[in-house]
Design a protein with these regions (language model features):
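C-terminal catalytic "cap/lid" subdomain
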Residues: 3-232
Length: 232
């Protein structure tokens, strides 16, 4: 959190919490089911992720930021109708109570930012029919960035365990400094970029198409330096 705090300018923080959700589910005797790295969210699992993402993880992050003097506010998509989703239709896989974002209250987010508040968004949305929906954190970040691009000059930063997109997954120092669309296509065809990094970069280009200035993929510890892979 200290590294996030050091990052200059207005901020919105989006977090995950999958490992904590898996741990609590196991303690409660609820099996965690994953397909292609995505969680199957049945009714019992939805209760777990709502508790963990919207409660435990979110409020601990808010408390940590407050300790640093950051006026943070923890939110889910249901709060003040911040982010509405439709339940994902069943195709090859039934992901259960998983949401695809359809509407973002950009004016609300912009208002909070103008008040000097740092919104901390949990990866949960709602369908406006009384149901919470588990929603991918990268998607939440991308949708928030696209919505805020109408109000601000936005840089979207995806943080994960590596220093950026790697040329060699076994070499943590082989960070690709910049990737344009042509290079992205080539890296995918060569198998250099694969798995979960593909949708992350697809989200990045969707954000750029919607007016986001730039996207950076990096480690949390380097977020304040702007290091990593710049996507354009």
């Amino acid at each position: 959190l200290g590294d996030v705090y050091k990052r200059q300018g207005d901020k919105v923080l989006v977090h995950g919490g999958g490992r904590s959700a898996t741990k609590l589910a196991a303690q409660l005797g609820i099996e965690s089911k994953m397909v292609n790295g995505r969680r199957i969210t049945d009714a019992e699992t939805l209760k777990v992720v709502t508790m963990v993402y919207g409660g435990l993880v979110n409020k601990n992050i808010v408390a940590g930021l407050q300790a640093l003097g950051v006026n943070a506010l923890g939110l889910t998509g249901a709060d003040m109708n911040l982010m509405r989703s439709d339940k994902r239709p069943v195709a090859e896989v039934d992901y259960g109570f998983v949401g695809d974002v359809k509407e973002v209250n950009a004016d609300l987010l912009a208002s909070l930012i103008h008040q000097g508040i740092v919104p901390v968004l949990a990866p949960l949305t709602h369908d406006k029919q009384g149901h919470m929906l588990n929603t991918n954190a990268d998607t939440i970040a991308g949708e928030a960035a696209k919505a805020l691009a109408k109000h601000f000059e936005v840089t979207l930063m995806f943080c994960f365990e590596k220093k950026g997109v790697l040329l060699d997954e076994n070499d943590d120092e082989s960070v690709i400094p910049e990737i344009d669309r042509i290079a992205f296509k080539g890296y995918v065809e060569q198998g250099i970029i694969q798995g979960g990094m593909i949708p992350k970069l697809e989200n990045a280009y969707q954000a750029i198409d919607a007016g986001v200035k730039q996207v950076i993929i990096t480690q949390a510890s380097e977020i304040h330096q702007g290091k990593g892979t710049r996507v354009f």
